[in-house]
């Protein structure tokens, strides 16, 4: 059987994708998959810990160059979490650009003044603030080593990183090019550490159809190894201040979403961002999740594209003829069954205790 290998010794990860599986994925069309029986979403507050990033991807407006990057103070984190909790959110979404490199001297000096040796130590403190405010942390800090993820895993309900693509694309180019192998390594490490994980692909950054199929199959292979992927995002790249490329059309998105649904196991959700896609035109292609939507903060990664209001999500579900259900940032299958303890699930004692003690979490789980 012909196979393509992704990864390698440098990042201690290896993923095999068979040619037969690629061909099957490429044959999938929307008519080949069934619509989901419901749509889910999480109510979050988006907390951009820092805009420093060692990468300079040409489609990304999130990062700021050295000297201009921001770093939220503990007080700012606490206030944003308070506002989110007051608005009924259950999730604190923490993002920052991948490990800020040595060019960001001001960021590292500020962290040192606050008593933190690394951005991951600070992320841990931020997650503690969120838990104290009554929110469940979901951190997306980009590429991570095993040690970095282990630093914060027990204070996160779930974590994530976008694979984006297994291809080497020009949009990732430059002296600090993003490596697909590093992303695969991060997803693999999450499984090793037992972290419920969200990942996904970007559509429209220079990848082709084969790349899309291989990317989804690589995610499936890692999930089959660890059983830890809770959802896969299919996200189009939209024009912004740094990227003026043509966005993928409606038929492209329909086919990619259908491919994702056909490739991924049934227990893995297929998510599309409702501020970046025409969800009504995709719900018959297997979409079952709309991701985190915030009633109080903007999408800091895609600031030009506002999240829809929650009643708009209800209208989308009504149009599709399916119920809309709120969920926690960790999927129910990763939690202990009724009467169980943290030892019976994937989340840490700290996270499970927070979920058990939170009336808001209990109400969401009961939906």
From Swiss-Prot:
GO molecular function, one term: transferase activity, transferring alkyl or aryl (other than methyl) groups
Names of required cofactors: [4Fe-4S] cluster
Family according to the record: Belongs to the radical SAM superfamily. CofG family.
Catalyzed chemical reaction(s): 5-amino-5-(4-hydroxybenzyl)-6-(D-ribitylimino)-5,6-dihydrouracil + S-adenosyl-L-methionine = 7,8-didemethyl-8-hydroxy-5-deazariboflavin + 5'-deoxyadenosine + L-methionine + NH4(+) + H(+)
Key word Flavoprotein present: no
Top EC group: lyase
Pfam families, sorted: Radical_SAM (PF04055)
Name of protein: 7,8-didemethyl-8-hydroxy-5-deazariboflavin synthase
NCBIfam families in the cross-refs: F420_cofG, PRK06245.1
Pathway given in the UniProt record: Cofactor biosynthesis; coenzyme F0 biosynthesis
Residue ranges annotated for the Radical SAM core domain, each copy included: 39-275
Cofactor info, note text: Binds 1 [4Fe-4S] cluster. The cluster is coordinated with 3 cysteines and an exchangeable S-adenosyl-L-methionine.
Alphabetized PANTHER family for the sequence: 7,8-DIDEMETHYL-8-HYDROXY-5-DEAZARIBOFLAVIN SYNTHASE, FO SYNTHASE (COFH)
Subunit: Consists of two subunits, CofG and CofH.
Enzyme Commission numbers on file: 4.3.1.32
HAMAP family: FO_synth_sub1 (MF_01611)
TM regions (residue ranges): none
Keywords, sorted A to Z: 4Fe-4S, Iron, Iron-sulfur, Lyase, Metal-binding, S-adenosyl-L-methionine
Binding site for [4Fe-4S] cluster: 53, 57, 60
Function: Catalyzes the radical-mediated synthesis of 7,8-didemethyl-8-hydroxy-5-deazariboflavin from 5-amino-5-(4-hydroxybenzyl)-6-(D-ribitylimino)-5,6-dihydrouracil.
Top-rank taxon, per record: Archaea
